[in-house]
Amino acid sequence: MIKPWLFEFLPELGSPSVEPNAQDVAALFGRYLDLWVRDEALGFEGIFFSEHHFGRSYSPSPNLLIAALGPRTKRLRLGVMGVVLPYYHPARVVEEIGMLDHLTGGRLEIGTAIGVPQELGRLNMTMAEARERNDEIVAFLDAALTNRIVSHRGKYFSFSNLRLLPRTLQQRFPPRWMTVISAESARRAARRRVRISTGFNATQLIKRIFDAYRAEADALGFEAGLSTSRCGGALPWRPQQAKRVCMRTRSPNA
């Protein structure tokens, strides 16, 4: 069954060489929040927000978008695809997951990502270091979501007997996702028993990624469940035409 989700980039106004009016930026956030509320009425399953830094996007901290949108919606699943783990301290990641799950009434989805080279490089972080940090934080995240008290000793972080609050509202924890761009990363996701998201690649590569994921999940006896492929699209500018397109997307048999 196809369940339509939205993937939001929240592009910046104007161009990098021209600073936009602050009131226009404030109005942009308000307009997007109103649109996302309307997406719930159109029947979308949920929204994933992207995380990007240093230009092109107004979404450097998408958890704040979830906190703002959660009280204004009732049914939409909300998450980040994905939280760029190499930027963060793992304890803070876990604590914010707990808070957001309560602020959304148990509608949070947990998505993680390694990040993109261009943005990581601005902080003098190589992809090799980013992968190491990501793997270490992912291991801690999985442990912290399932244990009341957690300790960790790794290359980048070490601490003992942390009690991270609040615990998530969803039991055992919210659905977990991982962004993947290769068959091997898809297999790693299956071994963690998490869902995957990929996209913006050739159809044959995407097929290989999902085939590898399902094969690994089957071998482990893990029910793969929901997974997503992200793609771009355009809607007619006339409201009624756009609504008809959205309603057809909502129901594949329409």
Would you name each region that the model predicts?
Residues 37-41, 66-75, 97-108, 190-191, ...:
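Acidic (Asp/Glu)-rich catalytic clusters
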Residues 4-8, 47-49, 78-81, 108-112, ...:
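Hydrophobic faces of well-ordered beta-strands that scaffold small-molecule active sites
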Residues 2-27, 86-152, 195-198, 202-204, ...:
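Flexible, glycine-rich active-site loops centered on histidine and acidic residues
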Residues 43, 51, 69, 100, ...:
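Conserved, mostly hydrophobic/aromatic
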Residues 1-73, 77-78, 174:
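N-terminal beta1-alpha1-beta2 module of alpha/beta enzyme domains
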Residues 181-186, 190-202:
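A conserved active-site cap/scaffold subdomain adjacent to cofactor or substrate pockets
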Residues 13-29, 83-91, 168-180, 235-238:
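Active-site mouth loops of central-metabolism enzymes
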Residues 2, 6-10, 128-164, 204-254:
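An alpha-helical appendage that flanks or caps ligand/catalytic pockets
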